[in-house]
UniProtKB/Swiss-Prot annotation:
Keyword Protein biosynthesis applies: yes
Protein family (similarity comment): Belongs to the GatC family.
Keywords recorded for this protein, A-Z: ATP-binding, Ligase, Nucleotide-binding, Protein biosynthesis
Name this protein carries in UniProt: Aspartyl/glutamyl-tRNA(Asn/Gln) amidotransferase subunit C
InterPro entries: Asp/Glu-ADT_sf_sub_c (IPR036113), GatC (IPR003837)
Gene Ontology biological process terms in this record: glutaminyl-tRNAGln biosynthesis via transamidation; regulation of translational fidelity; translation
Quaternary structure and interacting proteins, as annotated: Heterotrimer of A, B and C subunits.
GO molecular function: asparaginyl-tRNA synthase (glutamine-hydrolyzing) activity; ATP binding; glutaminyl-tRNA synthase (glutamine-hydrolyzing) activity
Source organism: Staphylococcus haemolyticus (strain JCSC1435)
Top-rank EC class of the record's enzyme: ligase
EC number: 6.3.5.-
NCBIfam families the record matches: gatC
One Pfam family from the record: GatC
UniProt catalytic activity: L-glutamyl-tRNA(Gln) + L-glutamine + ATP + H2O = L-glutaminyl-tRNA(Gln) + L-glutamate + ADP + phosphate + H(+); L-aspartyl-tRNA(Asn) + L-glutamine + ATP + H2O = L-asparaginyl-tRNA(Asn) + L-glutamate + ADP + phosphate + 2 H(+)
């Protein structure tokens, strides 16, 4: 069984910007352990004679060529913005100085 520590769960919650309780931390650790144990079943799958692939479907690029087009005027883009600064959208900070 793969053991997920409470420190790992707390770190994941921090990265996801989630505040979770002690009870939720324990529950999440158990859930992650179950998921990892289930995924570990792939280690025993017989892949003899199966060609390695990076995707299950044969993909082709169906995108168009990039072409520069005229965008909307800045004034129009910022018209309904809650807050602007120096001609840009201003949003609440999501990272502190240590993480930047």
């Amino acid at each position: 069984m793969t053991k997920v520590t409470r420190e790992e769960v707390e770190h994941i919650a921090h990265l996801a910007r989630l505040q979770i309780s002690e009870e939720e931390t324990e529950e999440m650790a158990n859930t992650l352990e179950s998921i990892l144990d289930f995924a570990k079943q792939n280690d025993t799958a017989d892949t003899e004679g199966i060609e390695p692939t990076y995707h299950v479907l044969d993909l082709q690029n169906v995108l168009r060529d990039d072409e520069a087009i005229e965008g909307i005027p800045q004034e129009l883009a910022l018209k309904n913005a809650k807050e602007t600064e120096n001609g840009q959208f201003k949003v609440p900070a999501i990272m502190n100085e240590e993480e930047a």
